[in-house]
Amino acid sequence: MRYTTSFIVFCFYIFLFTNLVQGGLVRICNHRIEGYGTCGPNGRKICLDAFWKNQPSPGLSKNLEGCQCEDRRKRPQFKGLSHSCSCCWSYQGNSDE
């Protein structure tokens, strides 16, 4: 029984050390995209399309966790109504970035 417990603890330490060295999962929620027009009923789809067209780091294997669309009213740089998308995404921390 003593050796079994020691073996389990040893495996746990290997697992923990491997994740610390590789960096684990990195989660980022500050990717903002702005665009023309309002969000409307399919605002989430607009944000998802914009995210995949304008990825934060094209070389990474990313997992999109979700996007939220917000109307931004009239803004001078868009010459009319605009929207803003806020997206959360994650990637494995052992990339070369």
UniProtKB/Swiss-Prot annotation:
It is found in: Secreted. InterPro entries: SCRL (IPR010682). One of its GO terms (cellular component) is extracellular region. Residues 1-23 form the signal peptide. The keyword Secreted applies. GO terms for biological process: defense response to fungus; killing of cells of another organism; signal transduction. Keywords: Antimicrobial, Disulfide bond, Fungicide, Plant defense, Secreted, Signal. Transmembrane segments: none annotated. Disulfide bonds join 29-88, 39-69, 47-85, 67-87. PANTHER family: DEFENSIN-LIKE PROTEIN 241-RELATED, DEFENSIN-LIKE PROTEIN 245-RELATED. Belongs to the DEFL family. This is Putative defensin-like protein 240.
